[in-house]
Structure formats: C-alpha cells, structure tokens
Curated annotation (Swiss-Prot):
One of its GO terms (molecular function) is neuropeptide hormone activity. This is Gastrin-releasing peptide. The lineage of its organism: Eukaryota, Metazoa, Chordata, Craniata, Vertebrata. Residues 54-134 form a propeptide. The modification Methionine amide is found at residue 50. GO terms for biological process: mast cell degranulation; negative regulation of voltage-gated potassium channel activity; negative regulation of voltage-gated sodium channel activity; neuropeptide signaling pathway; positive regulation of behavioral fear response; positive regulation of peptide hormone secretion; positive regulation of phospholipase C-activating G protein-coupled receptor signaling pathway; positive regulation of respiratory gaseous exchange. Stimulates the release of gastrin and other gastrointestinal hormones. Contributes to the perception of prurient stimuli and to the transmission of itch signals in the spinal cord that promote scratching behavior. Contributes primarily to nonhistaminergic itch sensation. In one study, shown to act in the amygdala as part of an inhibitory network which inhibits memory specifically related to learned fear.
Length: 134
C-alpha cells in the first residue's frame, strides 16, 4: 500500500512541476518593497514552521522502530534460551545429578546445643589470655 502512495506522489510531482520564482507570489499592486522584503513569503511564521514536522513523529516509523526493538528483544531471549539449553545438556552429559531437596524440619543442627564445653575451654587454652577476648 505504501508503494502505491509513493508512486502517486512521484507521478503528481512529475506532472505538476512547481512554478519557478519566489515562494509566495505577490500581487502586481504590492510588488514593490514588499516583494524585496519577504522574498520567501509574506507570512511571519514561514521561517518558524519550516522543518518543525519531524520524520520521527510519523506513526509508521514509530511502529517500525517498535517492531525492530521487539525483534531485538526476541533475538536476545532466543540466544539466552539456547545458552541455557546448552548448559543443561552439558550437565546431563557429565552425569550431574541435582541435589535432592529435603524438608527443613528433617535437618538437625551440626552441633549439640547442650554440649557447649568446647566453647568455654577454647579460650582457656591460650597462655595468659582472657578467654572472653578470643
């Protein structure tokens, strides 16, 4: 659809060339000083409005940019998935077994809370020191 619009615009430009001369034609009665002062047009906003319409504001370009960004993100996710899959396959090939998970209630503490004699004696083994400082 876009190519049809572009071709119609190009055809219109070829068939209807713009007149050569000043940008805004001046009537014969005012052709004196006014034509010399405002050679590019007699409206004060001509200079202010020139170039104000940005190409980036076009909805088609925004849509294309968002599609490109979505494609980049998709490619990154695809690469990350491939990397993760290759890591998992490498672990399976090595015969790595994931640890078995047990409920926390089955675990017992590594030391018996009633047997604290080792903690009291550890400071007294040092020569001439205060056991509480070590």
């Amino acid at each position: 659809m876009r190519s049809r619009e572009v071709s119609l615009v190009l055809l219109a430009l070829v068939l209807c060339p713009a007149p050569r001369g000043s940008a805004a034609p001046v009537t014969a009665g005012r052709a004196g000083a006014l034509a010399k002062m405002y050679t590019r047009g007699n409206h004060w906003a001509v200079g202010h409005l020139m170039g104000k319409k940005s190409v980036a504001e076009s909805p088609q370009l925004r849509e294309e940019e968002s599609l490109k960004e979505q494609l980049r993100e998709y490619a990154q996710w695809e690469e990350a998935t491939r990397n993760l899959l290759s890591l998992l396959q490498a672990k399976v090939a090595q015969g790595h077994q994931p640890p078995r998970w047990e409920p926390l209630s089955i675990h017992q503490p590594a030391w018996d809370s009633k047997d604290v004699s080792n903690f009291k004696d550890s400071g007294s083994q040092r020569e001439g020191g205060n056991p509480q400082l070590y």
